[in-house]
Amino acid sequence: MKLNMRFTVGVFFILAVAVSSCDTFKDEITPEKYSEAVKNIDANWQLSAVSRNGIDITDMMDFKRFHIVLNEDNTYELKNYLPFIVKGNGSWSVDDPIYPFHISFKEDGMENEVKTLIGFRTVDGKRQMTITVSPGCPSNKYVYTFKQVTE
């Protein structure tokens, strides 16, 4: 009888623990209230590294003089031109302001826009943007790495 009573109390205790552990977690921030921040890429971007077909060619030329200024009004300006997917100033846009994976450039006076891959990362606390281009020969793939210049 004592064994049966211990068994009953043990089962009751395990059942009580199991039932009380089923309380649902209530997060203070519900997904409906949370929103991802828009990635502001409008800035002065200085070319800091270039690779062609996976080979670093940064030291072959003074690439650091090349800047692309992405203005807040979605216009851009090229400074100290290097081979790029556009030759003149114009307007820019991204495919998604929250998760941008492509950037489009449209030169002033041109009908077609040029779309290319972009990437963002933070290195040593500083933002970097990579733009993948194939100017001229499509078998050559260039990856331009820009660092954000704060003036």
Language model regions located:
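Hydrophobic helical h-region of N-terminal Sec-dependent signal peptides
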Residues: 10-14
